[in-house]
Every structure is written in C-alpha cells, then in structure tokens.
C-alpha cells in the first residue's frame, strides 16, 4: 500500500505530543530545523501548548530547564538532527542532578542514512548516556507499526520520568518527504485503533504506585539543627516552620529562598567560640540538597562522623528525590518525601530542648551588624561584590531571584539574607546557560526577575541575551565584572599560573552586548546609584536592563580576609 510519508510523520508527531500534554507538558521549546518539521508543525497546531523558540540549541535546552525548574512540570524540547542534539547535553546533565523533567524530542535521519555519509546525520542513539532516565528510539513511522504500540512506548518512558525525574530522550527517525498537503483523514483506518484514546482526555495507559511510608521514629528531645538546602520557597517555609516549632537552629542555604536568625553561618562557623556551641547537637535534620557552603558541609561531616566514635549524632535527610545525596558517605536516614508530607507524619510534641542553642543568637546578631557597618552603612561603603550580596535582601522584595554560579553565590551565602523564590543551576554548577535558564524561569513564573551573574558566565551565554530582548516584564541582569575568574582567588591554585590559566582576564565590558540585543544598560559607580536604579526598574520599569558592576579582580578575596580578621577581633 502506498502512503504519504509526510502525513504519516505528522500523525506520529501528533500522537506523541498529545500524549505528552496528557502527562502534563504545557511548554514546548523549539529550535529551527527541517528534519524536525513534523514535530514543529504539530506542536504549533496544538492550542494547549505555550511555544518558546531560540536559534541556539544549547540555550534552548537551558531555557527549557528554567521552565521546568519554575513550573515543576515536564517541558518538551524539539530539535533537528545532528549536532543540534549534542548541544542539549549540558542542560540534560544539569537536569539529571537536579531532577527537572525535560522531554527531548530529537529528529533523526532514518536508519539507512546513518553511518553512510549522508548529510547532517550522526549516531544519536544513547548520545545522552547516563544523563537521561530513559531512552526511546522510535523506528520510522510506518503503517506496519500500530499507534497503540507508539503510545505504550511513550507511556513507558514518561512513567519512568514520573518516578525518577530528570530528562528522557525520544529519538524520532523521520524519512522524507517532510512536507505535504495531504490530509490525515485519509488514514482513518490506521487511526481507528486508538480512536477511544483520541476522543478521551487520559493517557493511554495509567499506573498507580502505592505509597510506602513507615512510621517516623522521631524524638523531640534531641538537640536538633535543621539545615534547609535547595527547595522551592513553599517547601522551605514548611521546613523553617517545623524548626521554629521545635525551637531548633535553622541554617538556610540561599537556594531555599528563606533566611533565619542563624544566617551568615559560613562566616561564624569559622569562629571556634561560636561553632563550639553548635557542636552540642545530636541530630542534623536536612531538608533538600545541594548545600553551597563548604564550611556547613564540613560541619555536618564532623558532627555525624562522631557517631562512629561513640557519640550518638544522627543525620536525617528529607527529599522527594530517590537520588543519593551524601557526598561524604555518612550514615544517613533518607526519607523520600516532600517536607510537607514528612512534617505531617511527625508527631510533634513539646520539646525539652527548645532554644537549646539560643545563646548563639547574640553573637550572630553581632555578625550581622558587623556586615552592615562594613559594607552598607559606613561612610566608606563602596560598590563592590560583597556590598551587592549584603544588600540582596532589600532588592528582592516581590521579585524572583536567579543566582549564577562561581563567586557571587558564595558571597550571598556568607553575607546575604533572602526571603523570596530563588533559582539556581547548582547540580553540575556549570557557568553555561545561565541567561537562558533565567529566561525560562521568568517565562514560567511571569514575575519581575533579578539575576546576578559573573562576567565569565555572561560571556559564555551571551547569545541567550536574545531571549530577553522581546521581554516586557521588568528584568534586571546584574553582571559582576571582576575581569575573569575571581573565584580562583579563594582557592589554593599555583600563584605563578593563577592569572594566565585560571582567572583568564578578558578586558571586556558589556555595554555593546546589551545594545546589540536591545537591552537597557547602566553602569553605576556607587552603591546608592545601584540601589536606586535597580529598585526603580523592578518597580516601574519595562523590559530588561543589564547593570554592569565593575570591580578590581582580587577585591572580593581581600575584603573577605579583612572582614574575617576584623570579626574575630570584635567577638
């Protein structure tokens, strides 16, 4: 039987995309390409999808990551064959570690055109290796392959994603012709096998996993410390409320978007007088993963390791992810649950240890005041990276925050306080794709956005500024330009090679980059100028403004060293 291959390609694409929508996909990200035409045209015709486009597949993948991160829903990505597929790998690797659900719909040449010199054909099978939770390599659409097989195959992949998170890869081999005016209605007999599904609204197959949740052997009379890692603001607030109910210290990572009276722990844990008081704990209760602070990670390791030396210190970890999050391989009780569901199962009683570490609060308040005096309120206060970090709480009211990687996120951990939704890429902690991810976050959330990104990270993802050029929502992109990798001033790299092989100074500024993409540009010279222009744009501005804050290369490291010395002397 002869058939129109282009129409059959469209039927398969429609079937796949309809099923993905029933699995919760609302956003589809598309890069240009001919081989992906069946998927692109079908996505464009489905009214239930929000379509996002970008000319760069690497940026497209990260934009999808941001959409998935903010929406907590799966996001589809459509690209053509060849290196277009390979360019998705960085975003896929990040999603593997942080759990965002991406559905990669990659167009491919049919099998007879792979490995024989055909144009734009590479071996795409297994290209994402262990960075995806499931693979589906589809044959070329054919009337000999029933649509109910296609649906159960897609369902298998999506059920796997529901259980394990991260990206899944569906490789679609489309033969030519790719374009046709033919009608799908001519293939009614082929479509009839899934007619009931087409008229319904449910996925073709359904699976239900019975929850298994043992009783929690919780002892409210332990001296607990609650650590809050990378969580949504809602979940972080639930964890914080639990800690406050127990009367225990709360050490909140910047990624949680919450703060507490116990903030700036990366600084005061370096002070033996203060750290020794917290060492009396016998339960570390951690909600969420990906702790930024090296000192906090070291403190957890030190405390829990003592349980192997006769001291009973327990380490409990609460996360909905099945993934192992235990970088120093401590004895750990992992509750696979959201903070809310876990807290609801705990029988919280009055605790005899309420306020057991409150003696620390006076000293911590002194640390906070010392930060303000040094970097915000002193007549000598200047515009530097630490001042930006210390000021962040005042800039982030009623806006979403995206923190880039490398130096600045660590400065926020040391000197900042937050009380808003915070987004990061702290899985692989790469410096690529950060503008694109932030754009995806804002597209999903629809709120004003304040982003902080380093100069090297900005250069790495410069073409993703195009994603902000057609944006009407107020956005401020703060580029901290210390002329290269100032993070290496904080690390024991060889002095003789630090500049040439680690920091790699570039001498670039960002005014013309902003102009090329039609963005507003400002370069403040004082902290007061910075505060005013950011506040004004986020409250009453429109579109995107890039704010460049230029500082000397080694300034941040020198200021931290001087501050720690001053703090130690004042305690």
Swiss-Prot record:
GO terms for biological process: menaquinone biosynthetic process. It is an enzyme of class 2 (transferase). InterPro entries: DHS-like_NAD/FAD-binding_dom, MenaQ_synth_MenD, MenD_middle, THDP-binding, Thiamin_PyroP_enz_TPP-bd_dom, TPP_enzyme_TPP-bd. Its EC number is 2.2.1.9. Binds 1 thiamine pyrophosphate per subunit. It holds the Pfam family TPP_enzyme_M_2. Its cofactor is Mg(2+); Mn(2+); thiamine diphosphate. It catalyses: isochorismate + 2-oxoglutarate + H(+) = 5-enolpyruvoyl-6-hydroxy-2-succinyl-cyclohex-3-ene-1-carboxylate + CO2. Keywords: Magnesium, Manganese, Menaquinone biosynthesis, Metal-binding, Thiamine pyrophosphate, Transferase. Pathway: Quinol/quinone metabolism; 1,4-dihydroxy-2-naphthoate biosynthesis; 1,4-dihydroxy-2-naphthoate from chorismate: step 2/7; Quinol/quinone metabolism; menaquinone biosynthesis. Catalyzes the thiamine diphosphate-dependent decarboxylation of 2-oxoglutarate and the subsequent addition of the resulting succinic semialdehyde-thiamine pyrophosphate anion to isochorismate to yield 2-succinyl-5-enolpyruvyl-6-hydroxy-3-cyclohexene-1-carboxylate (SEPHCHC). Belongs to the TPP enzyme family. MenD subfamily. Homodimer. HAMAP family: MenD. NCBIfam families: menD (TIGR00173). This is 2-succinyl-5-enolpyruvyl-6-hydroxy-3-cyclohexene-1-carboxylate synthase. It comes from Vibrio parahaemolyticus serotype O3:K6 (strain RIMD 2210633).
